[in-house]
Amino acid sequence: MWLLALCLVGLAGAQRGGGGPGGGAPGGPGLGLGSLGEERFPVVNTAYGRVRGVRRELNNEILGPVVQFLGVPYATPPLGARRFQPPEAPASWPGVRNATTLPPACPQNLHGALPAIMLPVWFTDNLEAAATYVQNQSEDCLYLNLYVPTEDGPLTKKRDEATLNPPDTDIRDSGKKPVMLFLHGGSYMEGTGNMFDGSVLAAYGNVIVVTLNYRLGVLGFLSTGDQAAKGNYGLLDQIQALRWLSENIAHFGGDPERITIFGSGAGASCVNLLILSHHSEGLFQKAIAQSGTAISSWSVNYQPLKYTRLLAAKVGCDREDSTEAVECLRRKSSRELVDQDVQPARYHIAFGPVVDGDVVPDDPEILMQQGEFLNYDMLIGVNQGEGLKFVEDSAESEDGVSASAFDFTVSNFVDNLYGYPEGKDVLRETIKFMYTDWADRDNGEMRRKTLLALFTDHQWVAPAVATAKLHADYQSPVYFYTFYHHCQAEGRPEWADAAHGDELPYVFGVPMVGATDLFPCNFSKNDVMLSAVVMTYWTNFAKTGDPNQPVPQDTKFIHTKPNRFEEVVWSKFNSKEKQYLHIGLKPRVRDNYRANKVAFWLELVPHLHNLHTELFTTTTRLPPYATRWPPRTPGPGTSGTRRPPPPATLPPESDIDLGPRAYDRFPGDSRDYSTELSVTVAVGASLLFLNILAFAALYYKRDRRQELRCRRLSPPGGSGSGVPGGGPLLPTAGRELPPEEELVSLQLKRGGGVGADPAEALRPACPPDYTLALRRAPDDVPLLAPGALTLLPSGLGPPPPPPPPSLHPFGPFPPPPPTATSHNNTLPHPHSTTRV
């Protein structure tokens, strides 16, 4: 008997000490997934210790159980001196760590002024429910949640083009599971991975789903532009989570060689930025970007120092030295920092990713043009009516938008995005013209529809198409979709299309298990079918890089209606046809999504902007003081690498804004005038618009000729000297050049060295395809050119005195004269600083 008792005690101890799934020594192989489903609280070993999960049954007979590991630490808590620092690997823990409850959310403020126009509709419509997920907040928040399937999925038919009725074939994947890491959105200010239960997606798609918390707002993205606080801590948190997965996911039955990152909104922007960062190289293989890119106006913060100053002043940390200011901010409580109301320019962000020369080494578009994302398969798309929140405030009634409200909204949109008064008049009228339905221009509902399309096209569609095209230009696999469905929920206007974030419940399989507090919809069988379709596409892509393979579309288990997606083959996006999949109840593969409007934003608007800047370079006026950082006397620690403020000359009396402007209406809007005057105004406006188009065409042709000339004259890049073309460095290191010689020297460097033609060096540089300035706020400081990185001194002092004007609005600025503490134009070490 005593021998039997000893044996039983030994078995129990073995189960507690690692005899369960993933048991054994840390770093050893985990056990099979089948054993995970046999225990109520399975234990898995990781490189840092053992964790105990919990087995959950799902409310659907076709879905197998899922083991959840909630609140697993992937980094050391960023407390004290670790605030405003990159994350570190977690410390090991003794015994078995309980991972059965959700972790705390990162500090955020849902009760302050929210950027509602940028947040998902389901979030803003259910703020009380969303608040329950972030009630438990802590700066110690760097945790992830893992959802591991316990079954390999049902038998299904294997796609066979040659067989009309293929037999049931076992294509279940019993090996290592693909891994899908979800990056939540929320304008980099709100949200948590706890809001998204990955159980249904894991069980239905036979993948391991992971969600995480990363630092948000000021704690995740504050930047001073120098070594004191480089920023991008939230992105570094995501990279650290990927490192943890690469090291540990095999213990949970996952495949570290098949990791896919996916996100929505700001999370999708993070996906794009991680694709472009060398820090994440080799940590994942595929990427899905839902309604977000790295080249939207809200994706990157181009003026972080401005908002850092504002925050520091609000909490009593306004110091001239940036190191002292950051140390002061470290001593403040997280709640005091998070609760400060620091409002960005409309359509922009106050705290978000910055171009630091390291994590984000250059402007995202420049990196994409250089082919920095060739190693990743990509799936990207948008929803039909992303800009719903932009329009709701302008919708005065159920009858739509009045003509005056339409004009005001467009004017406000242009005023907040473009910083030159003369150019805005041209852009404003051109945008109104393009987004007026001339067949039914007096219809308020049609005005509302076109206004919704305007915001959607500018903020989501055009950047997404540009990103997909840049990817496809390098023959890299990319799939594009448009989502045309949303669930029926109370409070949603009948005229609303699929808005920002409406695809998320279908991606996570919410219709299969019923409505939740965040998604209180009346889900129908069609919703269940569409969710199954989306999950199949997403998990197929995670498995093979092809959303069509290996699992075909088959939803006969839901209802007897045929699934139209069974006959659809999702084609790759290419630069010519630009194919995309229309995801809705009537799916179809089409090409050139909103091609006219996309070309308008990507081609015509940048040239109109260039036209203005070239015509008015000698008469640039100071933008409104409300959007400009006030000038100060230069301090001793101020860098000279920043764009100078415009000359402090007041505009002529006729240009001073004395009140609300009565913007010109479209011809025919002023019905109080006589017929003759109306005809005169109509003809005049038409001629004006034709002149604008003619000028735009002329300048476009001139720019194309100039671009071709630049390409012909540009020699192949060299690598020996660090100068484009491989020529020797210009002899300017020992002396300070006059401004004119500095400009010529810089243009000669870009043109190919000393041997280049000086006359050609004085020509404007070739502008980028998608003008960078159009994504910045009116008072944003532009980026330096690629390869022109310099370290900013440690100071939060006032801006420097203005250097001579640039030869081109998008060209580089002359480098500062060398000093005892200055650096060369190469990155001095792995951590460079923000270019502001």
From Swiss-Prot:
Cytoplasmic face residues: 700-836
GO biological process: gephyrin clustering involved in postsynaptic density assembly; inhibitory synapse assembly; insulin metabolic process; jump response; locomotory exploration behavior; modulation of chemical synaptic transmission; neuromuscular process controlling balance; neuron cell-cell adhesion
Record InterPro entries: AB_hydrolase_fold (IPR029058), CarbesteraseB (IPR002018), Carboxylesterase_B_CS (IPR019819), Neuroligin/BSAL (IPR051093), Nlgn (IPR000460)
Biased composition (Gly residues): 717-728
Feature: compositional bias, Polar residues: 824-836
One Pfam family this sequence matches: COesterase
Subcellular location: Cell membrane; Postsynaptic cell membrane; Presynaptic cell membrane
Domain of life: Eukaryota
Gene Ontology cellular component terms for the protein in this record: axon; cell surface; dendrite; dendritic shaft; dopaminergic synapse; excitatory synapse; GABA-ergic synapse; glycinergic synapse
Keywords: Cell adhesion, Cell membrane, Cell projection, Disulfide bond, Glycoprotein, Membrane, Phosphoprotein, Postsynaptic cell membrane, Signal, Synapse, Transmembrane, Transmembrane helix
Phenotype upon loss of function: No obvious phenotype, but mice present subtle behavorial changes. Signaling from inhibitory synapses is impaired. In addition, mice have reduced brain volume. Mice lacking both NLGN1 and NLGN2, or NLGN2 and NLGN3, are viable, but have impaired breathing, drastically reduced reproduction rates and striking deficits in raising their offspring. Mice lacking NLGN1, NLGN2 and NLGN3 are born at the expected Mendelian rate, but die shortly after birth due to respiratory failure. They do not show a significant change in the number of synapses, but synapse function is strongly impaired.
Signal sequence coordinates: 1-14
Record PROSITE patterns: CARBOXYLESTERASE_B_2
Role: Transmembrane scaffolding protein involved in cell-cell interactions via its interactions with neurexin family members. Mediates cell-cell interactions both in neurons and in other types of cells, such as Langerhans beta cells. Mediates cell-cell interactions between Langerhans beta cells and modulates insulin secretion. Plays a role in synapse function and synaptic signal transmission, especially via gamma-aminobutyric acid receptors (GABA(A) receptors). Functions by recruiting and clustering synaptic proteins. Promotes clustering of postsynaptic GABRG2 and GPHN.
Family in the record: Belongs to the type-B carboxylesterase/lipase family.
Protein name: Neuroligin-2
Taxonomic source organism: Mus musculus
